[in-house]
């Protein structure tokens, strides 16, 4: 290799190194994956009921939960909603699902989403994720996809 080519390669390497030395990784200003995934929402709608849950995971054991449901069919079957918490039992090493209490909207089809339910869930076992279940007074029920706990 002649002297000019060596000098050109050396100069390019120094310039590239100097340019990279002053840069910051692209992820430095972006929120962490946990922060991005901490708040999740699922909607479940079918003929008879429509509802949603928004979950903000706070730790490996807790989450803020906000749910609401509406009767969208006017068929005298009240719409109801509950949260399902997927947990890991530490002493047995097995997964289980805690079924929250039903929240019923008795306002009928013209009463909107009814009273919203806003509570903090705190489990004694690690919280793996949550789902929302919507029912039209037991006539038909549907469950959302999982909202995974990023912690």
Stretches found by the model and what they are:
Residues 29-151:
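Post-signal peptide N-terminal regions of Sec-secreted extracellular proteins
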